[in-house]
Amino acid sequence: MKKITLFFIALVACFFAGVECISAATAGGLKKASPKLPEFVTSGDGGTYYYVKFLRNEKVMSVSSDNCIRLYAGSGESSQQWRLVGSQDNFQFQNKDGQYIVVSSQSLGATSTGAANPNPLRPSTSEQPGGFKLQVAPNTDNGTGWEIVANSKSGNNVVNLWGDPGDGNSIGFWKTNDQNNVVVFVKPDSDLGAADYKIVGSMTFKPEHKLTLWYTEPATTAQLYSGGQGYSNWMEYALPIGDGQFGACLFGGVYKDEIQFNEKTLWSGTPARSSQGGKGYGKYENFGSIYAKDLSGEFGLTTDKAASDYVRLLDLTTATGKTMFKSAAGVEYTREYIASNPARVVVAHYTASKGGKLSFRFTMAAGSITADPTYANGEGTFSGKLETISYNARMKVIPTGGTMTTDEEGIEVIGADEIMVVLGGGTDFDAYESTYTKNTSALAQTIADRVAAAAEKSWADLYAEHVADYQSFFGRCDFDLAGTKNDMATNRLIDAYSGGTGADALMLEQLYFAYGRYLEISSSRGVDSPSNLQGIWNNINGVAWNSDIHSNINVQMNYWPAEPTNLSEMHMPFLNYIWAMAEKQPQWKQWAKLQGQDRGWTCFTENNIFGGVSAFKNNYVIANAWYATHLWQHYRYTLDREYLKRVFPAMLSASQFWMDRLKLASDGTYECPNEWSPEHGPESENGVAHAQQLVYDLFSNTLAAIDVLGDDAEVSATDLGILRDRFAKLDKGLATENYTGYFGTAIPTGSKILREWKYSSYTRGENGHRHMSHLMCLYPFSQIEPGTELFDAAVNSMKLRGDGATGWSMGWKMNLWARALDGDHARKILNNALAHSNGGAGVFYNLFDSHAPFQIDGNFGACAGIAEMIMQSNSGLIRILPALPSAWTEGHMHGMKAVGDVTVSIDWKNGEATRVELTNNQGQTMRVHYKNLANAKVYVDNVLTEVAVKDNVATLTGANGSVVVLDFDGSFTPTGIDAVKTDAAHDGYIYNVSGQRVNDSYKGLIIKNGKKMLKK
């Protein structure tokens, strides 16, 4: 992933603010609707008074005590309310106190958040000469709005929020098309004037389930570090829910409850190839938001009307969002949220402890797309079309008790006992159609039917089916560290985290693993398209890197935890995407031809969901080999032969691409030409280690798949011969060079390191670079073994590269150090990854990984890394506790999945395994490694069995579904037998003197048919 400047972070990561809009002509549905023009008065009294709100910081123009116009939260003061006297092209600002706004030549000095302001706006008793005019703001990063221009000023003449956005900013001038220029005009009676009511957080809350993210203030009021620095409340605090394809982010506002939603296939762009950032490429779009504005009258900005005992949470055990608080009268309010995969909708449920207390106005707003909602009969909807796909969203409000009315502005419910809101959304995208669309005319009815079907059910029924569905996946794998308890709000847990060994630190690490699996389930089900750089969640227009499908590490990392943490089904949208693009659609074959290859397929670094690519690093054609390894790994974990038969043609055609493309070097090996080690060093060189290791894995996997499929592989004898020849003569990308001290003393001079480039020294690279592209051989592959010179060289390369990294890079380093069998170093990287992000790597308070900005791949990389510390099987050898950190003295990891479709559960205490259970789901031969394996009693289906152990490795066999227990502490009791009873012992089976059933190979004192005997 490319670097991003802090300025660009600030540009793309701001919170999207909904603005009242009117329709405008659009091109491809991408241009935002024009903002609504405020009312102008010609003279005299009266007219409409507005807050003039800057979208960048959600603050309004206010008269300050130092005789300036500054930006503060609206509080209803008369000096904050402005009318516009004149016309759009020439008007004056006048507040309710009769003051005007003028451009001053009395400058303001520099502050910690901004440079000196030479021409600040100030209040005056006189009008501004020449007046002001309004023009539509071209910048829409934070929403659609206006720019204010001083008519008498030349050069930089657009009113501008001065300095970094915060509280108390002065107002100066800048050039047009800056996000700090954009304002909207809001009627004070339709705006609280503050981000939320007065909120008092709970002091006593404890979550029902330990695996819960929880907070004592809404995302709407929570403070951002250093005044924001471009990060948004969405990125820092909003909580994600998702059904795998359709999802939402929850803010927990009491005054205005926003549910911001996304759909995985809501992409602008086309299948074409375009320049980087070009229009044809498109981007992942923000679908929109629904708002529930409180009309109860129970809450306000003062302490006597505060919402007290406030808590909002995301329960990972049930995939449920929740907000809870009380009124001054003691009424308890609860709001619950789910994204139901069975129902394919998002559902919000509002209740109160006393009847008749729920009153809201519900509205919808489109996000980064153009659409105006319409309302009728308790429902709201909007729709539109982008360059390729069409979209539709619909909500339905279902109150119990009270009254409901619908007008052109929204849906109002007064005095209800309970309210359920059902939200549906989708597009006409189809991964298998040549146009990438299908059933466009039926889309609106499809969404309407989906919403109606859910609305017919009760909340209890919808919730029950949602939880049952979700837990069938989430409940398979359980990671627990002894002594942990979740009694600290998650933001405080992060702030207090120091990577120590205390219960709070271990709780955060345990929670982070569970969150990774939660995000995998929530972002990767349904449509055959992979999760993107932000999973399925995005709330802004100018999202970083278009929130696209990056093929040089990022999308692959999204799926690293899928197989080992027993979420194999979540891998399928990515695998089916690869298969469809490689075999069914033409684009990836076109990109292969663009690179001079008549056979096979490939894609480049940046990809959209239509097979389209940007022009960035189009020589990164090795992506096809990396993608194909995912096709094979899924087979290794599931042993699904029919699946392998289906996807094998994609593996074979990727191999054909490289069989034809490889060049024979002067040393007699085959090299990948014109390659690149992402994103690092020489931009074009033959024999780069990254590409060589990938092609080695591709060829090895393809040959292994041919062995499995036999004649069903349908490989010609010619191709098979070429494949074997190229594989035998392939440069494996596993050369070493001696370190010369060029980058300092991280490793001794003379140490061997892995070569990143065959023909260039390591000195062509960058010290501490975030990509470890030449270490594919260690992770995610297993091409080098512990105890070898190459293994040691890889470890030296990691030490030399250092621990500093971006968020996703730390995810990779965690896995690399786990494969290096150094659990404490792997946990050290985890410690770094869990530090709060203040402009760089770490996590946000909602545990989103920070590159920066938010990138979800780091969440998945860390989840996989924790799994690798506990169990590894990629080499075919099941390693038990291969890299257990010393801080994790006691705990368990139940329900992991090993290669060969083996379910593995491990318990440990004092850093040593106490029990290991292996369920052999398909009767495979299992090779298991553990340092003290010879000390374990081995039970196969409750039968004590002698097993040969050599070099801490045992080979175990069994029938389909057989369970092997490795008992290290003597605590295991075979099911159904505690001791030998005389009448039960006459069954022909063999027991030891402890009453445990043993097999026929057992030697020693035994009991058979009720008689003791010595078996030699």
Positions of PLM-derived features:
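C-terminal catalytic domain of Rieske-type non-heme iron oxygenases
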Residues: 534-535, 539-540, 552, 670-676, ...
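Lectin-like carbohydrate-binding module/patch detector with strong preference for beta-trefoil
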Residues: 25-197
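Short, glycine-anchored, charge-dense loop/turn motifs used at functional sites
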Residues: 516, 993-996
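C-terminal tail/sorting-segment detector
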Residues: 1005-1016
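Residue-level detector of functionally pivotal "anchor" positions at catalytic/ligand-binding pockets or at interdomain
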Residues: 193-196, 971-994
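Terminal processing/anchoring signals of secreted or surface-associated proteins
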Residues: 1, 159, 975-980, 995, ...
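Catalytic cores of secreted or luminal carbohydrate-active enzymes
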Residues: 286-302, 856-899, 903-904
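Aromatic-residue-lined binding/catalytic grooves and analogous aromatic/hydrophobic interfacial grooves
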Residues: 197-615, 635, 652-655, 665-670, ...
